[in-house]
């Protein structure tokens, strides 16, 4: 399995923690949109995540653009677990890897 970048690990962890659309991932990770959205595209192309658009009626009801929601695939879960075990020894490099979120939803 290919090693994940710190960015990819942070994004996968955010999705695993329940932050499932782009702006949520940006808020949770603190990474800029110019980093998060390309990472999401690469991870989807690599089958680590899948996406789906929310129902247009939901977005219309809430008077906002439709959101694209992301979910980890089994491959994404395995890649995140492997990264968590690899980086657990280096807490300064990836302090949240493998730990549940403490942020409120």
Protein language model annotation of sequence segments:
Residues 1-37:
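N-terminal helix-turn-helix DNA-binding core of bacterial DNA-binding proteins
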Residues 5, 72-73:
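Residue-level signal for threonine
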Residues 17-21, 45-47, 75-78:
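Short, charged/polar surface micro-motifs in flexible loops or helix N-caps
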Residues 36-48:
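Basic amphipathic alpha-helical segments that dock to polyanions
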Residues 46-63, 71:
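Beta-hairpin "wing" of winged helix-turn-helix
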Residues 66:
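Exposed loop/turn and edge beta-strand positions of beta-sandwich/beta-sheet ligand-binding modules
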Residues 75-105:
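Amphipathic alpha-helical dimerization/coiled-coil segments
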């Amino acid at each position: 399995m290919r090693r994940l970048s710190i960015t990819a690990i942070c994004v996968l962890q955010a999705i695993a923690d329940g932050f499932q659309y782009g702006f949520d991932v940006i808020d949770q990770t603190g990474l800029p949109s110019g980093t998060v959205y390309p990472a999401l595209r690469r991870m989807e192309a690599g089958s680590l995540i899948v996406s789906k658009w929310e129902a247009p009626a939901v977005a219309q009801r809430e008077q906002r653009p439709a959101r694209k929601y992301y979910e980890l695939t089994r491959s994404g879960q395995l890649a995140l677990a492997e990264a968590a075990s690899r980086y657990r020894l280096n807490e300064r490099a990836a302090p949240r890897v493998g730990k549940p979120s403490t942020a409120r939803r």
